[in-house]
C-alpha cells in the first residue's frame, strides 16, 4: 500500500499547502492524541515554524504523544503515523492516485487525475519504463561524466577543500538534463541556465505554499511564475524537436513520445522528473560520500568490493548491480540522512488505525524520518551501519516504507544507480576524506540537505 511513499515525500510541504485549497476545512474531532490549535487561523503552523522544520516538529510530537498523533494545519485536521506497525495498519483504498503527482501538478497548474484507474496505471508504467530505458541508453554518458569529475578531483592538491554539495548538484544536473532532453544540454551554458530556472522553481514549491509567503511576496511569485514558464517553454521546444526525429541518443522524452500520451501529459512528466530526480540524486550522492568520509572502515570495505567485482575491465550496469555492499551503503545513507523525511496521503474514506478513527478527507502524514530513527526497528539508529541491511527482516521493513523493492519509485531507483556508478568510479582511484573540525548539520526540507556546504578532501589510492 505504500507504493506512493517516495513520490509523496519529495513534495509533502506542497501537499500540505495545496490541500487547503482543494478541500473544505474540517474541524471534526477525532479523539486522536495531539495538539489543539495554537491559533484559530493558522492552527499549529507557529509550532512547526518554531521547531525548525516539519520533521523536527513531528519528532517532538511523536515523542510526546505516541505513534498516532494529531495537530492542525490551519483549520484542517492532520494525523501523523510514526511507527512501522501503525503504518502497516493504515488503509486507503484509492491506490490509483499518487499524492506526489496529484498535488505537484495541481501546484504547477496542471490538470491531474483526469483518467481512469487503468489509464493512470498505464501512464505510470510508461513513466517508470521511460526512466529505465533512458538510463540504460545513457549509461556510457553517466560513466563519462563520472570520469570527468574524477579527473577534476585528481587534479586537486590533497589539501584542496572540495565543495561536495555544489559538485554533486552540478553533476546531477548535467546527467539529468542530457538524459531527459538530449544533446541541447551538451552546452555548459545551457546547463547553467537550466540550473537557475530549476533552482527557482524547486525552492518555491512547498516552502512558499506551506507558510503562505509566496502569495505575500509579489516579487518572489513573479520570479517563480516566470521560471516555471521558462522551464515549460524549454521542454515544449525540445519535445517538438524530438517528436518524429531520428536522433542517435535515446532520451527520457523519446520514451514518452513513443507511448500514447498527448503533448501536455509528456510535458507534465518531463517537468516532474526534471525537478525531482536532480535533487534526489544530488542529495543521495552528497550524503553517501559524506558518510564514507566519516566511516573509514565502511569505505575500505566498499573499495574492496568494487575492486573485486569491477576489476580492471570496463564498468557495466550489470556489474554495478552485483555490488551488494554498495547497495547496503546506499540504503543506510537514505535511512541515516532521513533523505525524504515525510510522506503524505489524503484519507479518501473514513479509516481506522488501532483504536483511532481517521475522518474522511483528513491529511495523513507518514513520519518516515521518525520511523527511520526508531530504535525498536533500527538498533543504534544514529550509527551509520550498512551491515544492518544484510538482515532480511530489516530489508522487508525498508521495502515496506517505499525505499526499495516493489514500491521503489523511478526517481529513487534512478538515484541509486547514478550514485553507485559515481562512487565506484571515484573509489577506484581516490580516498575520500573528511575535513577536520567541520560542523555538519542536517536541514530538513522536501529532501534533506546539509545546512552549510559539505567540504571534503581527496587523496590518490594508486
From Swiss-Prot:
Q: What is this protein called?
A: Cytochrome P450 20A1
Where, subcellularly, is it found?
Membrane
Q: Which family does it belong to?
A: Belongs to the cytochrome P450 family.
> Which residues bind heme per the record?
409
Residue ranges of the TM segments:
4-24
One cellular component term from this protein's GO annotations in UniProt: membrane
- EC numbers on record: 1.14.-.-
Per its UniProt record, what CDD domains does this chain match? CYP20A1
Taxonomically, which superkingdom?
A: Eukaryota
Q: Which organism is it from?
A: Mus musculus
Q: Which GO molecular function terms does the record list? A: heme binding; iron ion binding; monooxygenase activity; oxidoreductase activity, acting on paired donors, with incorporation or reduction of molecular oxygen
Membrane topology field:
Single-pass membrane protein
Its cofactor is: heme
Keywords, alphabetical:
Heme, Iron, Membrane, Metal-binding, Monooxygenase, Oxidoreductase, Transmembrane, Transmembrane helix
